[in-house]
């Protein structure tokens, strides 16, 4: 299979699902149906066959790459005459709202932690690095939430830099999708994992995307391997609307929810509002900031109907 995108054709090896699945090479399935149920996100239909065909080969590839990095580190440590360093391997996972980044990240975390070379795999989402709700309101950024300027990039870079440098304990803020805000006084502590998976909308951005100050470091400067989860925009919008309806019946019904006022909407009203949110916020953010970074990824997972992976693109 060859990509129709000329840039992708030049940069990537392209695999159809069947071609990619044979690269599993006898890697055992370690997840049960119940495990997978616990990892699924809202409105996602990931099956065990999807894990077998797509995620197990990817787990094998990443294991080989991480082992090679570890061996290189040992050689360098021996050359420098120093004790083995403890710098974790950092994987970033990017893509649009509603594409299924979080589920992909959780499945990868579960599979990668089964390998003896890297049993400690942590997962951090960049949602926690969004400015607090009060700050977004004060800055007039509430309708730009998810855009690059809505993140505390200084805090995020300091976090990822601390992890990469091998600091014993580094804290990341925790985000609540119920209150639509950071949780005050709570944090996730990352303590020298073998692998860190960093999942978020804009983790592939570089200095090319920030002409104001290209001298400052970016998250992508600290990443060893990057993944982009891709889908056609009409599918993304459809999945967002379906997820919005699911939230209306679930999370939005919580009186503490920032979006509790949506809980009483009819299906038609909810669909109209979800479409408007997509057209005014999520769609423009995808077109302006997220999708343009796609071809910087080392690997692209392309989804088709029903959230099923159809193709995998691997950097040459």
Curated annotation (Swiss-Prot):
Q: Where in the cell is it found?
A: Cytoplasm
What reaction is this protein's catalytic activity? (R)-pantothenate + ATP = (R)-4'-phosphopantothenate + ADP + H(+)
One example of a Gene Ontology biological process annotation: coenzyme A biosynthetic process
GO CC terms? cytoplasm
Task: Identify this protein by name.
Answer: Pantothenate kinase
Question: Cross-referenced Pfam families, in alphabetical order?
Answer: PRK (PF00485)
Q: What is the lineage of its organism?
A: Bacteria, Pseudomonadati, Pseudomonadota, Gammaproteobacteria, Alteromonadales
Q: Which CDD domains match?
A: PanK
* Chief subcellular location: cytoplasm
Q: In which pathway does it act?
A: Cofactor biosynthesis; coenzyme A biosynthesis; CoA from (R)-pantothenate: step 1/5
The answer to whether keyword Secreted applies is no
InterPro entries attached here? P-loop_NTPase, PanK, PRK/URK
Give the UniProt keywords, A-Z: ATP-binding, Coenzyme A biosynthesis, Cytoplasm, Kinase, Nucleotide-binding, Transferase
User: SUPFAM superfamilies per the record?
Assistant: P-loop containing nucleoside triphosphate hydrolases
State the family it belongs to: Belongs to the prokaryotic pantothenate kinase family.
Gene Ontology MF terms in the entry: ATP binding; pantothenate kinase activity
Which top-level group of life is the source organism from? Bacteria
Naturally occurring in which organism (per UniProt): Shewanella oneidensis (strain ATCC 700550 / JCM 31522 / CIP 106686 / LMG 19005 / NCIMB 14063 / MR-1)
Gene it is expressed from: coaA
Q: Which residues bind ATP?
A: 95-102
Q: What is its EC number?
A: 2.7.1.33
